[in-house]
Amino acid sequence: MSQKKIIIIGGGLGGISAAIRLAQSGFDVSLYDKNNHIGGKVNRLETEGFGFDLGPSILTMPYIFENLFNYSDKQMKDYVTIERLPLQWRSFFTNGEVIDLYEDLSQMLNANTYLTNDDIQQLHQFLNYAEKIHRFTEKGYFALGLDKVSEIIKYQGLLRSLKGVDYFSTMQQAINRYIEKQKLRDMLGYFIKYVGSSSYDAPAVLTLLIHMQYEQGLWYVKGGIHKLAQALEQLAIEEGVAIHTGMDVCSIDTYFNHITGVRLDDGSHVSADYIVSNREVIPTYRDLLHFSNKKIAQLEKVYEPAASGYVMHLGVDKEYAQLAHHNFLFSNDSKRNYREVFHDKVLPQDPTIYLVNSNKSDPTQAPEGHENLKVLPHIPYIQNQPFTEEQYSDFRERVLDKLEKMGLTDLRQHIIYEDIWTPHDIERTYGSNKGAIYGVVADKKKNKGFKFPKQSEYFDNLFFVGGSVNPGGGMPMVTLSGQQVADKINALECKVTTDSRE
């Protein structure tokens, strides 16, 4: 294959994945990232003996990452160590009940005094339902990288498509049809956290997230998630990708509906045959291609930002024995919590909190007798009238109050290190649209759960990867998006070659 030039804007997991696959296919690939690390939101904080994953903390579907190494006849295990966690996470509820989530249902029954045989049987039936949706989506959405409802209907047929994704149900409606216990409903509904959305608004097709985790397991990257990003960076370099960190792309140059190259922050121009943007779609169109405010507003009506977060990294000089590696402290009213975040657009009164304590699996992540707590409640993305510092401060107190009331006794007294990220920090560091963490919200009414297509509808050689495009947010999905974009570009090149011979 001729050495066509490809520029990757941004080195998140989608960008580095696309870079690797395109380099493996023989393209001349250059990747530019404004930050000084590869991995995007897979970022790292190490201080005073504590280690924190600043972004994602859970690895699922590791085979998607392993495939990148396999294409080069290499094995991921030679680059990074991952460990399967039998106890996937622990859920705490306001009445004192605790439910441990195991991938083995018999183990889950034996470990949870609050669950009955009927509960486990209902869960088994629900997982059978979710598996059918998972298998249906594997054939077109994942395997072929289909981007639109019309493409899926064309491939699968109308009636089969409607039935295959339980089209007329939301995720929570589907869960509630099978599960009677409210706490199990809340726990399963919060799998929607992977895409920063509401289970009451998201389509039922996203129940596949639950089956994926049960089938593929939940994994920990030894030493922290950033080790996986470092492994991918090493593979990219070995495949010949030219990686330029600390270099920002300021604009994209065009000729009618064709991209000719990019302008860097040092004023230089770099030409390319294809551009793959790992920046979110709307920031790319708004900031690099200077779309009008009216056009951006039209796009956001369909592709609204997903949730952001108020992220607290706490180093504490106490060990909390009741915590697992991954923990969820649930709101007393999950439906209200979703409504406040996704509809009222306010800081929730009683948030559901995700709490990571990787020290439970990896003692190197905190000094002896200490723990590294990452605390993440979802909050709205940046609004036209942003929250004030006082509002964030009040919210911090509510979060700490909830943690202490639900078992983290005297937490405030034991905090010896604290680092906080608001949506403004997320937007400034990663360039995400309005500080969203998960790209585009999955909403049955707005977009049927679909995100932007991976190929631009305005430019013939511009592609996108990451959480704002299909197949969606979360580490494995954004990584898969990079591989799917590489497949699309390869297909285009094959078509060009074939056409030129005719």
UniProtKB/Swiss-Prot annotation:
Residues binding FAD, per UniProt: 8-20
EC number: 1.14.99.-
Pathways involved: Carotenoid biosynthesis; staphyloxanthin biosynthesis; staphyloxanthin from farnesyl diphosphate: step 3/5
Source taxon at top rank: Bacteria
Keyword Oxidoreductase: yes
Residues of the signal peptide: none
Keywords recorded for this protein, A-Z: Carotenoid biosynthesis, FAD, Flavoprotein, Oxidoreductase, Virulence
Pfam families xref list: Amino_oxidase
Similarity comment: Belongs to the carotenoid/retinoid oxidoreductase family. CrtP subfamily.
Job description of the protein: Involved in the biosynthesis of the yellow-orange carotenoid staphyloxanthin, which plays a role in the virulence via its protective function against oxidative stress. Catalyzes the oxidation of the terminal methyl side group of 4,4'-diaponeurosporene to form 4,4'-diaponeurosporen-4-al.
Protein name per the record: 4,4'-diaponeurosporene oxygenase
Organism: Staphylococcus haemolyticus (strain JCSC1435)
Lineage of source species: Bacteria, Bacillati, Bacillota, Bacilli, Bacillales
